């Protein structure tokens, strides 16, 4: 576990008695979930399903309680010595605090966060070491932390968890062999299986895009959506359920991208609708585009492409307040590329390159923009003070107990 100079006391988190109960019930809960819905098709691990573009779990999100961000710290080349932190800053406050200790669960596997309209934050803790399930915890004020029912292992994808306005939720889970989509009718207490990777791939909708992997879940106008990777040229794999059947509702890529396959990296709710971040493979090059809706319909507009050249990779992405969506791409000479997708024109605008080692940026209230940089156990908050000047406003070290998860 980790602590920091602004960490709340441990009693603010779920009790260890609760965690013992979770451990005792996890096998039963996961088994019950596995038994619900359709039976997975055998051999689901046979198809290649590794995304071409890997998206980090690092992200930021706004709720009524304040600003949140998830970052990995420690020895990032050692999975059991990588510890994910949950950073929080209340409205009007100048400093961040580390709330990872409130989760009271080892965070080596990563954190997946979700909200709807900023009312509350749901945190899913990906399994690590010998665990094979994901605890879920919900907070609306960063002080009270309510445990929800554990589910199967959340997939290693940024948008593996999604919440809807009515309290419904979707989750993407994977045991390394079978990838499934689960749904909760409300409260995150009970889950049922609504789709599997193999089941969707062999359906008429899945075959029409050449589905190879499930990568994200989300909601648009209250309708649950699944984002996928597809092998057929120019088809973006976004699926919606209608009358107990899944249908392909994603857009086609513009002809300017030529013969290209696409994978949905994320499904992000914006103030205007939904934006899907899509990785595109064109011959030997990779690009990123966004496909966005507005209003209650699923009429898509596709953005121009951002190119990932050579060793460049996707550092992080997330909501950018009223602006829409941000994407950060690694650059040369420690100068990463930060781009914001504007709505409704669906075009990219480049912002000043964030400082070195920035893991994620945070679009806060009143136009505030922070870059959160990490280096081992060191955390630094940089504020865009005007023009292209970043100003250091906070720095602290997180006390990490290396070797505690091995």
Spans of features found by a protein language model:
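C-terminal motif of bacterial Sec signal peptides marking the signal peptidase cleavage site
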Residues: 33-35
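Conserved Ser/Thr-centered positions that define the repeating blades of beta-propeller domains
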Residues: 89-90, 138-140, 184-185, 240-243, ...
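Beta-strand-rich domains and repeat architectures in extracellular enzymes and scaffolds
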Residues: 48-84, 107-112
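Repeated scaffold domains used in trafficking and secretory/extracellular systems
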Residues: 54-62, 105-115, 153-165, 202-219, ...
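Structural motif
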Residues: 78-85, 129-136, 177-182, 233-239, ...
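Entry beta-strands of beta-propeller and related beta-repeat scaffolds
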Residues: 64-71, 118-123, 167-172, 221-227, ...
């Amino acid at each position: 576990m980790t602590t920091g100079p602004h960490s709340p006391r441990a009693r603010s988190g779920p009790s260890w008695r609760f965690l013992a109960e979770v451990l005792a019930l996890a096998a039963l809960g996961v088994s019950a979930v596995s038994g619900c819905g359709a039976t997975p098709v055998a051999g689901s691990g046979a198809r290649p399903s590794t995304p071409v573009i890997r998206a980090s779990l690092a992200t930021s999100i706004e709720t009524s309680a304040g600003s949140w961000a998830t970052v990995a710290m420690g020895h990032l080349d050692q999975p059991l010595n990588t510890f994910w932190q949950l950073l929080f800053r209340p409205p009007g406050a100048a400093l961040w605090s580390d709330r990872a200790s409130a989760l009271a669960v080892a965070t080596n596997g990563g954190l997946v966060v979700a909200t709807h309209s900023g009312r509350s934050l749901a945190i899913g803790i990906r399994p690590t070491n010998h665990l094979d399930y994901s605890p879920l915890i919900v907070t609306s004020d960063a002080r009270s932390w309510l445990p929800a029912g554990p589910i199967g292992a959340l997939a290693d994808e940024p948008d593996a968890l999604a919440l809807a306005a009515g309290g419904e939720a979707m989750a993407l889970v994977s045991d390394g062999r079978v990838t499934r989509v689960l749904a909760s009718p409300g409260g995150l207490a009970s889950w049922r299986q609504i789709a599997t990777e193999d089941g969707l791939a062999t359906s008429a909708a899945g075959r029409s895009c050449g589905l190879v992997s499930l990568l994200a879940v989300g909601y648009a106008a209250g309708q649950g959506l699944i984002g996928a990777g597809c092998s057929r040229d120019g088809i973006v794999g976004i699926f919606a359920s209608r009358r107990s059947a899944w249908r392909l509702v994603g857009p086609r890529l513009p002809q300017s991208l030529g013969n290209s396959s696409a994978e949905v990296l994320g499904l992000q709710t914006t103030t205007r609708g939904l934006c899907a971040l899509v990785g595109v493979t064109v011959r030997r090059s990779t690009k990123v585009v966004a496909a966005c809706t507005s209003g209650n319909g699923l009429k898509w507009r596709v953005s121009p492409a951002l190119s990932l050249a050579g060793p460049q990779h996707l550092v992080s992405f997330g909501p950018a307040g009223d602006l829409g969506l941000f994407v950060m791409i690694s650059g040369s000479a420690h100068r990463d590329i930060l781009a914001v997708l504007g709505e409704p024109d669906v075009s990219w605008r480049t912002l000043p390159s964030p400082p070195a080692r920035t893991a994620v940026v945070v679009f806060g209230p009143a136009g505030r923009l922070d870059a959160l940089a990490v280096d081992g156990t060191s955390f630094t908050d940089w504020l865009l003070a005007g023009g292209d000047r970043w100003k250091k406003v906070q720095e602290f070290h997180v006390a990490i107990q290396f070797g505690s998860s091995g």
